[in-house]
Amino acid sequence: MIRISLISKHYQQIEPLIQQFFNDLQIEYKLTNYTHQTIQDIYFVEIEKKNDLNILNHLKKLNSTLIYIIGPKDFDLVSICLQMQTHLYFINNELEKQFIHYHDFIQKQI
């Protein structure tokens, strides 16, 4: 089972998109709110500004942990996220469309 955490102020809006995505992949998963005590396989982290990236320094992770960022269309933030070795950057107002676009890529990462 894949352990997934969503860190977002918009949890209620994003959660169904993530659930639908993993249900479509037919992968057994457990999606929870982020807590400092757990290590997850995948983190979805929503950011709004550069300071929000500090959360990445506090994530408990393994070498195989995937980190997906959900954020604004801001090329400086995208660049910083890539330097921080995150695995994908989703534009927040295009999230559903980007899940479809990256379906095969994410499936291979998992």
Regions inferred by a protein language model and the residue ranges of each:
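Charge-rich, solvent-exposed alpha-helical interaction surfaces
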Residues: 17-21, 58, 80, 98
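Residue-level detector of alpha-helical secondary structure
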Residues: 19-22, 26, 79, 103, ...
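A Lys-centered signature of the CheY-like receiver
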Residues: 91-92
